[in-house]
């Protein structure tokens, strides 16, 4: 097993070499990748403030932007209240796999160009936090959407199973952390796009219920 410090030191060396060779793009991408790698090493069960999750998403986008150039847009289109980003807790690496799905299964089939927009608001009826990820990709038929959150079948095609596992796992982690009333809902229309809504409780860092449910109590 490779020592994580060796990986981080190597990435820092690459960043330093890129800087002195006046290659800012490489330096920026390596910096983003190093931060993502450190976050991955911390695991996915821990609850983090939404603003920390958004920072991870920004690092992921930095890397993908260099891959796709100006053809890809990922943007937080609206934040209803800045306090949501500071106070709302979310399982680490919830947004990144959903955005990855939107890119590889929604935008790539139409040439890798398009947008993924994130809207952050509250449900006026319940006070829950709603994160809506909308892409303008190829979309999906209703019969496919209906089973996306089911537990993946063993015989599924590799690419579809990868997508299915990612969505199912994110939904499972949210429900494990907060209860069955929370998680993902998915709406999609072929040739129009897909919207994934994440429902979370509005609970601040250190909230006893969030801590209890995260520990399975």
Regions found by a protein language model. Name each.
Residues 1-187, 195:
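Two-component histidine phosphotransfer core
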Residues 194-203:
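Short C-terminal beta-strand
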Residues 202-210:
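C-terminal coupling/interaction segments
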Residues 210-217:
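Intrinsically disordered, low-complexity acidic/proline-/asparagine-rich linker or regulatory tail/stalk regions
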